[in-house]
Amino acid sequence: MAALIAENFRFLSLFFKSKDVMIFNGLVALGTVGSQELFTVVAFHCPCSPARNYLYGLAAIGVPALALFLIGVILNNHTWNLVAECQYRRTKNCSAAPNFLLLSSIVGRAAVAPVTWSVISLLRGEAYVCALSEFVNPHSLMVGERSFPVAHATEILARFPCGEGPANLSVFREEVSRRLKYESQLFGWLLIGVVAILVFLTKCLKHYCSPLSYRQEAYWAQYRANEDQLFQRTAEVHSRVLAANNVRRFFGFVALDKDDEELVAKFPVEGTQPRLQWNAITGVYLYRENQGLPLYSRLHKWAQGVVGNGMTPDHVEMSLLPS
């Protein structure tokens, strides 16, 4: 049963790795929507106090969005490739345009969750109403022939998000809520439209500027996914066998289960890779060609024995970043 569950998880992992990044972004967005709903129900409580409402409302929208953005940057492998590039090569082998494109890719992916959070917050309107209720102009509030009392208007308006205030002003409370939710939802829909246009233009520009055909880009994406999967799996086995060998040398024996015994017997490990090899396969990578043949990754480049960035006429570097 455990093996079946593990196999199913492996299949799902391979499925999502083989598909377009839009699937992953969709899952991130759905998870963010659920988190936002839970936050609104459990944790959001407007203080309904002048000066505090504004800070609390902005914090309810901005702080989780900022946290989600930073988490997205941290979890993106391209971030650490860029850091490694700066550390080992000082980005001297990459022009400004590729570095900017890679940074844009990192920011774009990391922005999925915070943008989703902001959009849902604006469409719901609670945080916006909480933040701006006290700033509604009391002179603009008219219901029939009744006008809103100006005395202590700020304090009364600040209490409206909590459903509080004088009973005879409940009709104004509904008007304030309706007006602010209209503004909040309008900003939310505008944000959706702006993001959709930016995504569309970015995708069009990426494919227009790409030197590769659509099929070769798809093949490159499949290669990267397969290389990463095989590298991680092999690194896990290599480190496990190496650890078993070192423990055996120290104690004279090593306690292995059946699976580990098969691994040690099947994959003998003689040594480790030097640091220079690890550095060679780590960092920012652009699509390159060597004598007309594509090099799809730093590992591919290292395996082919290509040294440097290939700036001779027989080498072609293309400023195309992975999706």
From Swiss-Prot:
Main location: membrane
Subcellular location: Cell membrane
Membrane-spanning parts: 22-43, 53-76, 102-132, 180-206
Region (Hemichannel docking): 145-152
Function: Pore-forming subunit of Ca(2+) homeostasis modulator channels. Mediates ATP release from astrocytes and ATP-induced Ca(2+) influx in microglia thus regulating neuronal ATP and Ca(2+) homeostasis, synaptic transmission and neuroinflammatory response. May form intercellular gap junctions. The gating mechanism remains unknown.
Annotated InterPro entries: CALHM
Membrane topology classification: Multi-pass membrane protein
Marked site (Not N-glycosylated) residue numbers: N168
One Gene Ontology CC term in the entry: plasma membrane
Region annotation Central pore: where it falls in the sequence: 14-39
Quaternary structure and interacting proteins, as annotated: Homo-undecamer. Two undecameric hemichannels can assemble in a head-to-head manner to form a gap junction.
Domain of life: Eukaryota
Topological region Cytoplasmic: 1-21, 77-101, 207-323
The reaction(s) this protein catalyses: ATP(in) = ATP(out)
Protein name: Calcium homeostasis modulator protein 2
A biological process from GO: calcium ion import
GO molecular function, one term: monoatomic cation channel activity
Keywords: Cell membrane, Disulfide bond, Ion channel, Ion transport, Membrane, Transmembrane, Transmembrane helix, Transport
Family: Belongs to the CALHM family.
Disulfide-linked positions: C46-C130, C48-C162
Extracellular side: 44-52, 133-179
UniProt-annotated stretches for the region Intersubunit interaction: 214-251
